[in-house]
A protein has these predicted regions:
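Bacterial N-terminal signal peptides that target proteins for export
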Residues: 1-9
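Bacterial N-terminal signal peptides
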Residues: 8-17
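Short, exposed beta-strand "edge-strand" segments with a Pro/Gly-rich flavor and a Y/T-containing core
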Residues: 19-20, 37-44, 124-126
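Boundary at the C-terminal end of the N-terminal hydrophobic targeting segment
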Residues: 21-23, 29
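Short, compositionally biased low-complexity segments
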Residues: 24-25, 90
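Generic signal for short, ordered secondary-structure residues
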Residues: 28, 32, 101-102
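Short, recurring structural edge motifs at helix starts
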Residues: 33-40, 106-110
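A cross-family detector of function-defining hotspots
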Residues: 44-195
Length: 195
């Protein structure tokens, strides 16, 4: 059977679409660049943040206006995270990168730990090993419902503070109406005042 040229363009279009969806998101911002993450700057307005995310080819962009949040997907090394941009008085204040949330007994070791490790390795490669750190915790070590979670790594840099954490919290299950314990890893990127 001969290859039909009529199939070449649709296949090429499909392949390029798959590659763009699987491509890595932008990396962490350089020190002293003035950027929090990617090309997002402290003080960017809601419209500017949305425009930069669209132009940066981020996907699944949505807003929670009542909470001052803009969210989208981030992908690094095959892992999917969620970027949350926190706005205060319509100005970007900080960014939070959150791993997948899960509740199954195997989730913590099989999904959360590799996501956390991927984030840690990216941060060490970018900002160096000079930080406060401790090992990945056992689930029972993670404080339940504490917004700060269990801090595993923190970088106190000239222009930003980075904190990598593991969190545990309860969410009401819509099917059983019972509280279910979830966990995830998070990375807080907080620019320093005046920087």
């Amino acid at each position: 059977m001969k290859f039909q040229p009529a199939f070449a363009f649709p296949l090429l279009f499909l392949f390029s679409g798959i590659v763009s969806v699987l491509a890595d998101s932008p990396g962490m911002a350089d020190l002293g660049s003035g950027f929090i993450y990617s090309d997002l700057k402290k003080g960017d307005s809601r419209e500017v943040v949305l425009d930069k995310l669209r132009k940066g080819s981020f996907i699944q962009i949505y807003e929670e206006r009542d909470r001052g949040l803009i969210k989208c997907s981030v992908r690094w090394n095959g892992f999917r995270y969620e970027l949350t941009c926190k706005l205060v008085d319509d100005k970007l204040e900080l960014c939070l990168i959150e791993g997948q949330k899960g509740w199954q007994f195997s989730f913590y070791d099989e999904v959360l730990n590799p996501q956390w490790k991927n984030l840690r390795e990216r941060l060490v490669a970018k900002y160096g090993k000079d930080r406060k750190f401790r090992d990945f915790p056992k689930l029972k070590q993670v404080p339940m419902g504490d917004p700060g979670g269990f801090v595993t790594d923190s970088w106190d840099l000239n222009d930003r503070l980075l904190m990598l954490t593991v969190q545990s919290f309860k969410i009401k299950d819509c099917c059983t109406n019972k509280m279910v314990e979830y966990s995830c890893c998070t990375l807080l990127i907080q620019p320093k005042q005046g920087k």
